[in-house]
């Protein structure tokens, strides 16, 4: 099989819609609270009402893709991602099975889970210092993951996609860092490249990032769109973003 024949025809990456956790985190950061006030496990946090509306907007956009509509859908098993995918497919009228893949889950935060910037500084100042010194690409909090760890998961997912879904239109619903790591792996970026992208943009909820197979590109696929929100704008759905916690310069 030739190199380009291994890839899907297109790869559509969608960040999950706004969740109740996004709302709680924004409130905690605004109030300077050390802890995000939500009792659920991160993987169980549901969408907000706005998040459900955003998901339907993505579905309406999917319905208009015609021959480029997804034929395969993979999603993080976290509730906010799975519900985004389910609602979008229903709104699009696409009857496709969801493939839940734990490799697409959110980055594990370990001991820093549910802590705000202020909370991390108060409870784990050593981790704040380590992240500042090492940088967030390589820093791994106790019990958690670095961005490199997420990149390893993404490489594994891409191995599966190229093996099982070559030539197909594949949609993946996942999380902010996971989507950034898809760019890192597919485009063969360096640490400084992906950190620059992270500094410049915060991925919007339900934003769309697309790659298409490109026979002129030795890497196999070319980035077509990144962090686009036109599906939301076309449906007059509010755009929301959850910025990365700025523990250290990015």
Language model: regions and residue ranges:
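Glycine-rich phosphate-binding loop signature in dinucleotide/nucleotide-binding domains
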Residues: 65-69, 161-168
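Residue-level preference for the first positions of well-ordered beta-strands
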Residues: 11, 165-173
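Short, active-site-adjacent cap segments at secondary-structure transitions
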Residues: 20, 80-82, 106-107, 178-180
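Phosphate-handling substructures
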Residues: 20-46, 91-155, 222-227, 235-242, ...
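Acidic, low-complexity terminal tails and accessory targeting/binding regions
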Residues: 1-11, 94, 107-121, 184-250
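Short, well-ordered beta-to-alpha junction loops that form the rim of enzyme active sites
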Residues: 16-17, 75-79, 97, 103, ...
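Active-site-proximal alpha-helix that buttresses catalytic centers in soluble enzyme cores
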Residues: 2-96, 100, 123
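Active-site signature of alpha/beta-hydrolase-fold catalytic machinery across serine-
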Residues: 87, 181-185
